[in-house]
Curated annotation (Swiss-Prot):
Any one cellular-component term (Gene Ontology): cytoplasm
UniProt gene name: queA
Enzyme Commission number(s) of this protein: 2.4.99.17
InterPro entries: QueA, QueA_dom1, QueA_dom2, QueA_sf
Listed pathway(s): tRNA modification; tRNA-queuosine biosynthesis
Class of enzymatic activity (EC top level): transferase
Protein name stated in the entry: S-adenosylmethionine:tRNA ribosyltransferase-isomerase
Chief location: cytoplasm
PANTHER family given in the database record: S-ADENOSYLMETHIONINE:TRNA RIBOSYLTRANSFERASE-ISOMERASE (PTHR30307:SF0)
Subunit structure: Monomer.
Biological source species: Dechloromonas aromatica (strain RCB)
GO BP, sorted A to Z: queuosine biosynthetic process; tRNA wobble guanine modification
UniProt record similarity statement: Belongs to the QueA family.
Compartments reported by the entry: Cytoplasm
Keyword presence, Cytoplasm: yes
Length: 352
């Protein structure tokens, strides 16, 4: 199979891009994809599709208020999107301005504090390095003066509802600048139902970066360089995966961020390594999955690396058929949209 970036394009009517969440977290639709079989369900049906002894792995990252507006020392307006807080006084960011700021220049953000641009950052130099130019703490300043960073395809500014609904109910480790959106469908009652049915849960942390929205700027998929994100897998989660494997249960990743962390830390026997690391894993058709058996995920952007990931997991032709079905049936797309439950049916022979 020889695929290009254009092979992951699909027509999407703009009105199918969800601008607001469903009235209830579990109120979204769920498209169950098992090979060529497509079944339209409700997300509330999920507990009936799992069995006792299965393990759901969630990403417990919490979205920080990463967007700032301000003024450059030259007087021009600037918008800053934090990519990562490195420590209390240093951060990496994206910059939107009429002209990119130079190293050594300063910016006044939220009319409250000043930062200094120290240079370019990131594998391709797409990000900028910041340091505080006065006493302070980026974590505290973000919480006090920052704005919630909604995705670029959501057209309204962050509202009070977004402060709650663009976080998972189990978010506890601050650091993401985009939500792990598959988890947005779970509410406390569903988590309790899953536990009562003997379906186990475990957590890891992967801080989703703004790079998740970056378009691919290459024609050949092999030429793309993935952004890097940091993840942490605690001992309890690694132990839960080992126990699930030994008992014949399935490991179900809640979201592509959980899947990327698990596969990055995976061993050939389906277990995972404990600890923290950086990952720039780029999963495309032909990838051999080692850890994850099923995947819960939202619908992804055309020509995106995440669409390639789900195509690798469930099969390229199956995903194309599923997305065409979703468009025809008026499913809601992207972060606030509906969900999919994917069975792992991709084959190494699908390699691009």
């Amino acid at each position: 199979m020889s695929l290009t970036v254009d092979d992951f394009d699909f027509p999407l009517p703009p009105e199918l891009i969800a601008q607001h969440p469903a009235a209830e977290r579990r109120g979204s639709r769920l498209l169950h994809v098992c090979g060529e079989q497509l079944v339209d369900r409700r997300f509330a049906d999920l507990p009936t599709l799992l069995k006792a002894g299965d393990l759901l792995v969630f990403n417990d990252t919490r979205v920080i208020k990463a967007r700032f507006f301000g003024q450059k020392d030259t007087g021009g307006q600037v918008e800053i999107m934090l990519e990562r807080i490195v420590d209390a006084t240093h951060a990496i960011c994206q910059v939107r301005a009429s002209k990119a700021p130079k190293a050594g220049s300063t910016m006044r953000l939220a009319d409250a504090f000043t930062v200094k641009m120290t240079g370019r950052a990131g594998a391709d130099g797409d990000f900028f390095a910041l340091e505080l130019a006065e006493p302070g703490d980026f974590w505290e300043l973000s919480e006090r003066y920052g704005k919630l960073p909604l995705p670029p395809y959501i057209e309204h500014p962050a509202e009070g509802t977004d402060e709650t609904r663009y976080q998972t109910v189990y978010a506890r480790e601050p650091g993401a600048v985009a939500a792990p959106t598959a988890g947005l469908h779970f509410d406390e009652d569903m988590l309790a139902t899953l536990q009562a049915q003997g379906i186990n849960t475990a957590f890891l942390t992967l801080h989703v970066g703004a790079g998740t929205y970056r378009p691919m700027r290459v024609e050949k998929i092999a030429d793309h360089r993935m952004h890097s994100e940091r993840f942490e897998i605690p001992p309890a989660t690694a132990d839960a995966i080992t126990t699930t494997r030994a008992a014949g249960g399935q490991v179900i990743a809640v979201g592509t961020t959980s899947l990327r962390a698990l596969e990055s830390a995976g061993n050939e026997d389906g277990t995972v390594q404990v600890g923290g690391a950086e990952t720039s894993i780029f999963i495309t058709p032909g990838y051999r999955f080692q850890v994850v058996d099923r995947l819960i995920t939202n619908f992804h952007l055309p020509k995106s690396t995440l669409l390639m990931l789900v195509s690798a997991f469930a099969g390229y032709d199956h995903i194309r058929a599923a997305y065409a079905h979703a468009v025809a049936e008026r499913y809601r797309f992207f972060s606030y949209g509906d969900a999919m439950l994917l069975e792992r049916t991709g084959q190494p022979s699908d390699a691009i």
